[in-house]
Amino acid sequence: MFDFDTNTSEMFLYDDIGPAWMGMIDASSVMAALKKMPQDAPVTVRINSGGGSVDEAVAIFNALERHPGEVNVAIDSIAASAASYIAMVGKTITIAKGGVMMIHSPWTIAMGNATEMRKTADVLDLYEQRITEAYAARMQGKYSPDEIKQFLADETWFSADEAVEAGLATSVENIIAEPVMIAEGRYAKTPKMFIVRKDAGERTAYPHARNRYRAIANRAKFDKR
């Protein structure tokens, strides 16, 4: 699910990242939503996504980075793979209690001859350099570049507290994350508590708590008055 609210200046990335024709969240949808937002007001991007297309994620990151207003990120349950990269655009990055983040090296499915496959590998290397720089900007002073690259190679999962400790998030939000179940085999090291067995090709279903989080956001705005 992708949605946005111009009244609260919130954007909800509650699905996989990828082509809109496949029912996923694409960069065009995000850019269209940003144009409707107050240009001088802070925007909150609420994430509950297992990731997806790195191409779309880079385009979404760039669109958010170009937005003239301040961009903050709230991880409502999970930000894995490409979604964790998008999260790095936030001036602040909060994560709900029980929420998780995952970072890993980008991968893809490709077909072609040896020359074409080498070109694909080169593109993946470029993407890895780009996302490594984004993570490193947050984790600098805590981990060396080689350690960060190893986190990516190992497919590293972080609890909410671990994400803050690592520098990937700025604070833990005092709400309980809704659990999300990830299809078995989607990632190499998915924590067992998140694994659900699904038929081949079946997509992960994300809990859609839009109204709940919108109410929380409105309450937070009221409390600041």
Q: Where are the predicted features?
A:
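N-terminal organellar transit peptides
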Residues: 1-82, 89-225
